[in-house]
Amino acid sequence: MELSGRKRKAAFDPERRVKVRRRDVEKADAWEPPSEDEQDARSSSPAEESDQGQEEDDVDEEDEEESGASEPEDDREAQLSFGARLRLSQKRQKPKPKGSTEQDPSDAQEPSWRGREARQGNAKTVSKAAASASAPGRKTKSAPEEMSSKRPVSRYREVVKPPPNARPKPRDVRFEQELTGEDYQRFRRNYAFLDEYRNDEMAKLREIIARKKGVTPADREDAKLKLRKMEDEKRSQDRKDREHELMREHKKKEKELVKQGKKPFFLKKSEQKKLLLMDKYAGMSKGQVDKAIEKKRKKVAGKEKKQLPFARRAME
């Protein structure tokens, strides 16, 4: 007869008699019917127990799935070589990107003020990254500037961008070069008092030059230089005023002709110079015109002479 280590199971006999224990009998005698409150509590408890039991079953199933999924992974990792396992662990321990907003478990253990500072820093970096992505610019200092194609291109190119909160600097229109048409006429009307100041100053300088006593030679020479400079400025200003006056008269005549049904005629730069030259010589005598022409000829000849190359020495 062979003996096995396993115990034999008893055969199931439905007519088998079981002896009743004494303590079971005592419990049955001591049983009392439950009260109404207990019955209400029991009637509500099965639903709660079923919910709790269902939740526990779900948790157990999730744990079993995780453990079942992790066991094959552990078996696969155990079969890998040491180098492969090292690379896999390094890949898992890679740092998070700067723009990621996921919270590490170590951050939860830090004090509240540290976590607040870290969140503020992350928000600042994210806002800076968003601003740099939205605002066009240049990748490097030598690269061309990138502009958004969704914004309309301005007619005027901004060479120097002013700071965002900069106030406009005051300008002196007397030194503005681009004054034409009505702007120039308005400027001359608004600053007509400057001509009076200049005339008064020129009269005082002439008095200083004509005075024989109480003026040193150095002061007299200084007054002569100032007077010559102011006279040149006045002549150039008068010439400029005359040019604007001639162009205004020409435009006025053309407007009258256009009203009569004729086509407008616009002067070219060369024709404007001829018109100004004719007006300049119209108020001169014959001798003054000859002197002006000779002076102009010498000036042009001097410029041409400067442009000529130096004469080469001949070989002996």
Curated annotation (Swiss-Prot):
**Compartments, record wording:** Nucleus, Nucleolus
- Bias (Acidic residues) occurs at 48-76
Q: Where is the composition biased (Basic residues)?
A: 88-97
| Keyword rRNA processing in annotation | yes
Q: Which keywords are on file for this protein? A: Coiled coil, Nucleus, Ribonucleoprotein, Ribosome biogenesis, rRNA processing
Q: Which residues form a coiled coil?
A: 218-260
Signal peptide range: none
Q: Could you mention a single GO BP entry for this protein?
A: maturation of SSU-rRNA from tricistronic rRNA transcript (SSU-rRNA, 5.8S rRNA, LSU-rRNA)
- Which cellular component, as a GO term, is one annotated location? nucleolus
Disulfide bond entries: none
Q: Where is the composition biased (Basic and acidic residues)?
A: 10-30, 142-160, 227-259, 301-316
Q: Answer yes or no on keyword Cytoplasm.
A: no
Mind telling me which PANTHER family this protein's record contains?
RIBOSOMAL RNA PROCESSING PROTEIN 36 HOMOLOG
Family stated for the protein in its record: Belongs to the RRP36 family.
Q: What does this protein do?
A: Component of the 90S pre-ribosome involved in the maturation of rRNAs. Required for early cleavages of the pre-RNAs in the 40S ribosomal subunit maturation pathway.
Q: Which protein is depicted?
A: rRNA biogenesis protein RRP36
